[in-house]
Regions:
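Structured core elements
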Residues: 76, 99, 120-122, 146-148, ...
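Active-site beta-loop-alpha junctions enriched in small/polar residues
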Residues: 57-63, 80-83, 103-105, 124-126, ...
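General structural feature for long, well-ordered alpha-helical segments within catalytic domains
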Residues: 17, 33-36, 40, 44, ...
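Charged (often Lys/Glu-rich) extended helix/loop segments that serve as interaction or gating elements
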Residues: 257, 266-412
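Conserved, mostly hydrophobic/aromatic
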Residues: 37, 59, 81, 113, ...
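Short acidic, glycine/serine/threonine-rich loops at helix termini
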Residues: 67, 90, 110-115, 132-135, ...
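Active-site loop/helix belt of alpha/beta enzymes
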Residues: 2, 152-291, 347, 353, ...
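A charged N-terminal "starter" segment
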Residues: 1-143, 187-191, 225, 349, ...
Length: 412
């Protein structure tokens, strides 16, 4: 993982030993590099124009301390719930730098978004448009909106993270766009700023991005010819990170070409990157509980479970696994598994590792879709989160306690 260094056999994040962090704060524990997070965001901010917007996808990692850090650097935010919106406002984000995506926005969430006058509510269906119009009328306030297009394009990634196919729940199919825009315009309650699309996550093929962009440009030009004053194209997010030696697309190389296509049309760009900002900033540290040998396999049973980090179980996702301190021990093939009472509670199969029962493991690239997807399954306590920058260490979420686990059940 980028941002990790091995010094005299010990693994470091920034200038801090992961072994020392595990000993100080216990395991499992998430650890993030603040310097890597800043570097990733700046890779986007330095590649766009002043009027363009980079809106970090909050769902990838929504810890408020990270949101504050990103807001201070000038990031906008892409939210998919009312509470994500509230978190961003609490973190100091400007409403004009927030977009609200997602297919199931409640009336309460729409009231909040319209009252706060956020940059855009991205409309996902005619039924949602009807609700937005009604809410705006009740509030006597215009809603700022873009229309999300379903481009029917595959992101060539896991089916669960493809969002641009015709069969997905997201966005408006092309044949429904004109009538939807006409309804929005006639209402007098919608300020239509542009059109949006998001193909999906883990994109490594640049052609998919430009297939989507060219479709959006064609649709935007058609709407502009009809008299609609659009100013933005929201291209979504989706640039992939390298979990297993995939060749990453660099923001600058992609965005220079994107902007060159938008400039002649006087259209601004909005992006919603998530994983490519937070993904490679974090590790999940876990200690060995048992080294179990059967006639066929060696199991490394660790103290992290699928409740702590779901991606390997849910998506069969590959994450590199390293020992935080190298030891003089024979390398063996291990099945790295957790303690949860599910056969799917696995983190890696046939991993070649040199281990003993005191070893601490680092599961790499766990900064996105890690803690945010954790749960209390098996009545397990969710882990803490630590932010490291240089030599500075900050606890940004404490470890849950048994009292925390009971509180919502007892205090009723």
């Amino acid at each position: 993982m980028k941002g990790l260094n091995r010094i005299e056999g010990k693994l470091f994040i920034d200038e801090v030993s992961l072994e020392d962090l595990a000993k100080e704060y216990g395991t499992p524990v998430y650890v993030y590099s603040g310097s890597k997070l800043k570097e990733n965001l700046n890779g986007y901010l330095s590649s766009v124009r002043e009027e363009d917007k980079v809106c970090y996808s909050v769902k990838s990692n929504s810890n408020i301390h990270l949101l504050e850090l990103l807001a201070d650097l000038g990031s906008g935010f892409d939210v998919v719930s009312g509470n994500e919106l509230r978190k961003c406002l609490e973190a100091g984000a400007k409403p004009e730098d927030i977009v609200f995506s997602g297919v199931g926005k409640t009336e309460e969430e729409l009231v909040l978004a319209i009252k706060e006058n956020i940059f855009s509510i991205n409309i996902e269906s005619e039924e949602e448009l009807d609700r937005i119009i009604k809410t705006a009328k009740d509030l006597e306030k215009k809603a700022q909106c873009m229309i999300r297009i379903n481009p029917d394009i595959s992101s060539e990634s896991h089916p669960y993270i493809q969002t641009g196919l015709k069969t997905s729940k997201f966005g408006i199919l092309r044949e429904g766009i004109d009538s939807l825009v006409e309804k929005a315009s006639k209402s007098g309650l919608i300020n239509l700023k542009g059109i949006a699309s998001h193909v999906g996550s883990q994109i490594f093929n640049k052609e998919l991005i430009f297939e989507n962009l060219n479709l959006l440009i064609e649709i935007a030009n058609n709407l502009i010819r009809q008299g609609h004053a659009l100013s933005y194209i929201d291209l979504g997010g989706g640039l992939g990170i390298s979990y297993q030696e995939e060749k990453e697309l660099k923001p600058r190389a992609v965005l220079e070409e994107v902007i060159s296509k938008l400039e002649p049309l006087n259209l601004n760009l909005l992006l919603e990157p998530g994983r490519s900002i937070s993904g490679n900033t974090g590790v999940l540290l876990s200690k060995i509980e048992y080294l179990k040998k059967t006639s066929d396999l060696n199991f490394a049973v660790i103290d992290s479970g699928m409740n702590d980090f779901l991606r390997p179980s849910l998506y069969q996702a590959w994450h590199n696994i390293s020992v935080v301190e190298t030891i003089n021990q024979k390398e063996l093939s291990y099945e790295v598994v957790g303690p949860v009472c599910e056969s799917g509670d696995t983190f890696g199969e046939d991993r070649i590792l040199s281990l003993n029962e005191d070893s601490i493991l680092a599961i790499h690239d766990a900064g996105a879709y890690g803690h945010v997807m954790s749960s209390n399954y098996n009545s397990r306590l969710r882990p803490p989160e630590i932010l490291v920058e240089g030599k500075e260490i900050k606890v940004i979420r404490r470890r849950e306690t048994f009292d925390d686990l009971l509180r919502q059940e007892r205090d009723v």
